Amino acid sequence: MESLALYERSAASSYLKNLVRRLFGRFYWVTYSSALSYKGLWKNGLFEGHGELKYSNGTKFSGTFSNGLKHGKGILVSSSGYRYEGDWVKGKKTGFASIRYKNGDGFEGEVKDGLRHGTGQLHDALSKLSFKGSWHKDIIRGDVNISSAHWCFEGPMPNSDGLTRGEMRYSDSSIYLGNLKDFIHHGAGSLRSSSGDCIDGIWVDNLNVHKATKKDKHGVYWKGNLRNLKPQGYMHVKLPNGQEYDGLWENGSMLRALSVKNRTGQVSPYHMH
């Protein structure tokens, strides 16, 4: 783009030296071979103020110029679908801008030399995800905010294996804090569900938890494994009144009680009747 900007500047200068200045000395339309055409203001033989550029490849620019270069606010639209609306500095895309890429992605934020650089938000058309954070030469770095239609993540950008640790907020008001893989619960973490349940443990995915501790909205305390977020296998249960018991569970239903501890701490085996 720098070489093109220099071309625009030199082309305008050489042509205008021989141009009969007319039309109030302010507006003109001029075509430089098949490369580009310009309509707008000029000063001292160079593009100056507001003008419009049209390129032979279909690209169009409308905005302000200074000393023959794009400078200030402007909109660049290409025939491929790329659209840039924002700041320009000495012919370069630098400042704040709104960009639509030809693949459908969109970006709003700070740019430098045409690259995402600074604070900004990228909307990915394919995944339907939105990435908000700090950018360096088109790459997002540090802590990010990633959101979809159903959840929002805050934490470090996932590595090449999709692993990270952070906070997930869901549309049903559930909140998860812990390890993730591809934005699925994976490893140590805790969940506070919209129903009031609090679950800590080693997560296999969003529904299955090993070595789990769970306290439900009624104050019942569970310790064991969860499948589909329901008690599965051997579980230790403590009731709000202090009574405790051990049992075997299947898909959230108790198959049998193994032992019972009363409020005085005495433990006795539970006999099936």
PLM regions and their residue ranges:
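Glycine/tyrosine- and acidic-biased, solvent-exposed loop/turn segments at the edges of beta-strands
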Residues: 1-273
